[in-house]
Amino acid sequence: MLKTLPPTIREKKRYISFKIIYNNELSGGEVVNLIRSSLINYYGVWGSSKCNPWLIDYTHPKGLLRITREEVDFVKSALISINEYKKNPINIIILGVSGTIKKSREKFLKVPHEKYYKVIQRRKKENSYKNRLRK
């Protein structure tokens, strides 16, 4: 088994809270594709892999994106540059940048962390129960 890296060697992360203004509701996969394509168009393949984007959470219209600390400005500018999706206008507003998921959810997404975590756990249990019923 591999040991975990000490905090001094780990990659430093930041969490960007954003809000999407769009006519229709987008799924998490569509948001991931939208973010990935905008980063590649704005920053290139090497730059987009360097910022290491990861969608932590998305519930329409707000979401949380994890990126590396050094690439915050590039990712923010790439997200702001998105203006069209499937020939419809779209706008992404950056609500803020935080160092932790908890503070980002409390400050920008206005969701208490503990309650939110319990809701996610309940949804996972419901989905696993539904999957068992399908089998």
From Swiss-Prot:
Q: Which reaction does it catalyse?
A: Endonucleolytic cleavage of RNA, removing 5'-extranucleotides from tRNA precursor
List locations, semicolon-separated: Cytoplasm
Q: Which UniProt keywords apply?
A: Cytoplasm, Endonuclease, Hydrolase, Nuclease, tRNA processing
Cited Gene3D superfamilies:
Ribonuclease P, Pop5 subunit
Q: Which GO terms describe its molecular function?
A: ribonuclease P activity
Q: Does the keyword tRNA processing apply?
A: yes
Query: What does the record give as EC number?
Result: 3.1.26.5
Output this protein's name: Ribonuclease P protein component 2
> Which InterPro entries does this entry report, sorted A to Z?
Pop5/Rpp14/Rnp2-like, Rnp2-like_sf, Rnp2_archaea
Offer one example of a GO biological process linked to this entry.
tRNA 5'-leader removal
What domain of life does the UniProt record list for this protein's source? Archaea
Which lineage do the record's taxonomy fields give for this organism?
Answer: Archaea, Methanobacteriati, Methanobacteriota, Methanomada group, Methanococci
**Recorded GO CC terms:** cytoplasm; ribonuclease P complex
